[in-house]
């Protein structure tokens, strides 16, 4: 059932008018949603998760539509791609930002952009670039979070330097050919992520859960290699103290398949903490599924740039309200320690 039918309308025209032809600011609504989420779910140890999802389409008229890969279909298909930021804390999770990705075949065609009312100041931007803008907006808005997590799409570009300067930790996916080198460590490490993983000893691995899944704990084997300790000031960071750059490797128990993550965290951070941060990425996948199934995230009835952002922002608002209600109905049990131990740093004596 599409959103017009669910609303009892005989056709999509009313919703198309509201989303595509009325004059209202979708970015203002986005900011309202963000502030609402923080009001109800804020925690200093929260994780900002960056990911994308596909909106399957027919035809070529909808803004940003192209034949491109989407995990929603698991293949290259005709679709739009939206990049999202989700706020994940021990109180719940919800979206706080979004933007529509425009492929170069769109940004290189001014007539096509004009036909769907793309603003004149919007040009081509890679998905990692869109992510840096979302992170910047969250920082400017004083959103409380300690970590950023993302898959291999977002483990490249300027995100690492941006987060280091902001004093934020991260666990970001990288591909198997990504090169890592250690310095100042007793055990030198050098090579591609895949080569490093293949030379690890059995004692280097630790079986840990990345969180609860639908079938129980999401268990994998993990290996964490500290590559270098750096003073925060070396990255022009707002923070002080020693921070560690590292490589986190995940090995699937069933078939030994590897996944790799570049990490940045306060010195002494445990592997359990980094695994927990990486495991928070599951929350945005759950959010996409729920938002599409329950709130019509992918049932947009308009074709314009403004229509997409308005529709998606409204779906985000509905999801945020559900997350707040769920949190109030299911408060976490009181803890003797800090509120979110899964994403805390274990303090250890300085080794240098």
Where does each model-flagged region fall?
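Short amphipathic alpha-helical segments and their helix-coil junctions
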Residues: 58-69, 290-302
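Short, solvent-exposed helix-loop connector elements
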Residues: 263, 269-278, 292-310, 329
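Basic, amphipathic alpha-helical segments enriched in Lys/Arg and hydrophobic/aromatic residues
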Residues: 297-352
């Amino acid at each position: 059932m599409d959103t017009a039918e669910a609303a009892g309308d005989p056709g999509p025209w009313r919703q198309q008018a509201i989303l595509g032809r009325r004059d209202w600011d979708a970015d203002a609504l986005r900011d309202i949603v963000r502030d609402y989420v923080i009001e109800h779910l804020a925690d200093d140890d929260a994780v900002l998760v960056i990911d994308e999802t596909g909106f399957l389409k027919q035809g070529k008229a909808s803004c940003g539509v192209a034949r491109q890969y989407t995990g929603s279909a698991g293949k290259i298909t005709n679709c739009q791609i939206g990049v999202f930021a989700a706020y994940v804390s021990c109180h719940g999770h919800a979206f706080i930002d979004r933007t529509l990705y425009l492929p170069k075949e769109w940004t290189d065609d001014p007539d096509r952009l004009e036909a769907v009312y793309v603003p004149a100041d919007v040009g081509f931007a890679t998905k990692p670039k869109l992510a840096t803008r979302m992170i910047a907006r969250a920082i400017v808005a004083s959103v409380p979070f300690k970590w950023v997590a993302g898959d291999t799409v977002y483990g490249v570009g300027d995100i690492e330097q941006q987060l280091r300067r902001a004093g934020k930790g991260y666990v970001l996916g990288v591909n198997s050919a990504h090169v890592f080198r250690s310095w100042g460590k007793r055990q030198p490490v050098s090579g591609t992520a895949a080569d490093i993983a293949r030379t690890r000893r059995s004692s280097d691995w630790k079986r840990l859960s990345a969180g609860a899944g639908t079938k129980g704990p999401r268990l994998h084997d993990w290996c964490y290699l500290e590559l270098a300790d750096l003073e925060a000031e070396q990255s022009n960071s707002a923070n002080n103290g020693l921070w560690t750059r590292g490589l986190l490797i995940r090995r699937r128990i069933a078939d030994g398949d590897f996944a790799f993550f570049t990490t940045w965290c306060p010195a002494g951070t445990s592997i359990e903490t980094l695994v927990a941060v990486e495991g928070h990425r599951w929350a945005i996948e759950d959010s996409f599924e729920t938002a599409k199934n329950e709130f019509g995230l992918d049932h947009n009835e308009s074709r314009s740039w403004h229509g997409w952002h308005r529709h998606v922002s409204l779906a985000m608002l509905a999801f945020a309200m559900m997350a707040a209600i769920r949190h109030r109905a299911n408060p976490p049990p009181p803890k003797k320690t800090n509120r979110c131990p899964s994403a805390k740093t274990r303090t250890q004596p300085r080794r240098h």
